[in-house]
Structure formats: structure tokens, C-alpha cells
């Protein structure tokens, strides 16, 4: 179990948990680990960017100081989306990238996430190596001086390359679709107008004026209420919401209904399959994807491979087996023909492309997708990882699954961050599904409760 790194880098309340001192150490130790084996022996180059949080510049300066102290050349991108940084690391042939962002988390939090030269998140082994250096009592890393120190180069115009990359994935303009776009007052805010105007989109924006404090504040992919209202009010055909670092996209249909990552993947995947472009006729998702998603895919002859929770695991499965589409219910969608990580703006563009190519509304494109009612209860327990050792809990799950008779599913898993056991079920009706969950929760509470 890693001490500092979670499922998406190092995160915590800025200046309290994630301090400038920690950012310096992460820059110094992380930079060393990622560039120590540079084959040509030249100076290593690392791209650094951030989202729009007020704490971003504080952490950025500390992080960059750490990188410079081990002789790394830093290309400073300023405000950039996480997928944008991932793309630029590869496009520039850099040795690594570091994004300062806490994604969809509130403004109090921030995070530091490393990418390798391939634009992908680090392996657990690399993160463990960085942690070991951070916790070493005496810092024995190199301390170059004079010409051996790193330098900083302004690379804010890298955003132009990223916007051009996104535009090049779309073969035609996207005129004829009216869309409302929510930038979450985050990293995408500065790029939305330029990108969508270049593609002749009829669009309006909300939450695209970051002030350092309003990122994800009742806006963006995790708070779509205002976007839903605006889509209906403006008579738009579509709404798109990104999160703070724009690695996820949630949509809204013409009636104001939220459309999550499962539904977005169904629309894009169905279109790709119809045109022979969905590799191995398979979509990769996590275990959290709705059973209705799998059933809808089956009716179209598309397979669904599932991984544990986390877009990293979806990405690994896709690369290992050559799949072209995958993602999470939360809106992380990976279209690997274009990018190897979840990209909210890329996803939104390709959802619009399907709507234009088919001439259908989002409601029409989703007509065959019938979502199963889902109930999720978080149960406080003494030891979240021991549930399989409690026979009464296992028996309760088996009993519910037997009663479901294939028309539903149960998923029990420990929380990744808290001492909770998550009990989730999907079934034919909300009432029946609630009853299934209640039966399991009762036994879990009795056997494992605090």
C-alpha cells in the first residue's frame, strides 16, 4: 500500500496536506526517478502544467524548484488540461510531465500527478520508488551547480498544438448542432471558445471564468443542474460538462437529462462498430458500469470487458489487448485511436460528430439503452478488506444473487480511501433493488460494523 500516492497521484488539502515542502520533494525525487536513466545522457526535459486553483501557482513554483535542483529543464505550460499535458509530453518528445490538479475535487484540494514519456500515468513500482526517496532520512540525490542546474522555458503556446490536435481528429465542421458547454471554471475554460469556434459549432458557455476559487463550484461534470436548465432554456440539442482538469465529460440531452460515461460510450461505440472501427467489437469499462449498458451492447453484438475501478486499469486493459474504446461511468472516456488517456473535450467532439453523421438526437441514439435501477450504500466497518472472510456476508450475497436469477447484479467492494464497504446492486425495479441491498447491508453491519 502506497503512503502518498493514491489512484490518481498525490492529493490532499493544499498547504496543509499537500504543502510546498512536499511539492518540492515530489519534484526533486520524482524528477530524479523519471529521468535518471535518460539514454542519450543529455539534459532531461519535463513539462509542468496546472489547473485554475488558487493553490496551483504556489505548488507549481515549489515543484519546479525541485525539478531544477536535479538538473532538469522545465517547460512551463501554465494552465493546461490533464489530457492536454499528456499529449504534449508525447508530441514534444519530453521525458516526463507533471500536472498540478485535483480534477473534480473542491478548490481546497490539489494534487500532483506524474506522466512518463509515453504520456501515461506511472506504474505502482515507479510511485513506490519515489516514495522511498521522499522518506529517506538523508537526501543523497545529486546537487548540481552552475551550468548543471535546470532551467525554465515558457511553453504556454503549447496549447496551440493541443487545440490543433483536437481539431485534426474531426474530419468535418460540426455546424448544425446547438450546444451549451460548462467549463467547470477549470483548465478547459481558456480553450473552449477557440476550439468550438474553429469547428463552426453553434455554442454558448457557462462557468468559463475562473477566479482561482470557483473551480468545480456547483458546476462542471459533477454538478450538472445549471447546465441541464440552460440546455432546455436555450433549446439546445446537447450540453457538455467538463471537470476541473477536463479529463472527463458528462453530457446532457435535448430534454435536460444527464448522460453519463456509460451512455456516451454506448453512442460512440455503436457508431464505431457500425462502421467497422471498434476494435475487436469490444468496449472496456470498470465494474461500476450499469448492467443495462452491457445488455444494450449485447443486443448490438458488442462485448463488454470490465476492470477494477480506476481509469488507469481501463487504459492498461485497452493497451494490453488492443481495444479502441473504454472508460468509466464518471465520464473518463478513452478513444485510443486518437489519445491514450481520458480527454473530456475530445470525447465531447466525437459525441457531436456521431450526432451530425447520423442526424439523430441524443435521445434517439440512446433509445435502446435501458438503465437498470441502482442502489449503493456505504457501510462503516472495522476492517473493509476482510468481508470475504465473513461467511454470513458471503451467504447473504449468494442468496440475493440467487433471487436475482440473472436479472440483476451485486457488487461489494472496499472503499479506496475510507474504512467503508460499498454495497451496490442493480435490479429490475428501484424497490426490489433497495430490498436486495438492505438484506446485505443488515448482515454486513451485524458482522463487521464499527
Swiss-Prot record:
Reported modifications of this chain: Activated by phosphorylation.
Record InterPro entries: A-D-PHexomutase_a/b/a-I, A-D-PHexomutase_a/b/a-I/II/III, A-D-PHexomutase_a/b/a-II, A-D-PHexomutase_a/b/a-III, A-D-PHexomutase_C, A-D-PHexomutase_C_sf, A-D-PHexomutase_CS, Alpha-D-phosphohexomutase_SF
GO molecular function terms attached to this record: magnesium ion binding; phosphoglucosamine mutase activity; phosphomannomutase activity
Gene from which the chain derives: glmM
Modified residues (Phosphoserine): 103
UniProt-annotated binding residues for Mg(2+): 103, 243, 245, 247
Enzyme class: isomerase
GO cellular component: cytosol
UniProt keyword list: Isomerase, Magnesium, Metal-binding, Phosphoprotein
Active site: 103 (phosphoserine intermediate)
One of the GO BP terms on file: carbohydrate metabolic process
The reaction(s) this protein catalyses: alpha-D-glucosamine 1-phosphate = D-glucosamine 6-phosphate
Functional summary from the UniProt entry: Catalyzes the conversion of glucosamine-6-phosphate to glucosamine-1-phosphate.
Cofactor binding notes: Binds 1 Mg(2+) ion per subunit.
Name of the molecule in the record: Phosphoglucosamine mutase
Record family assignment: Belongs to the phosphohexose mutase family.
Presence of keyword Coiled coil: no
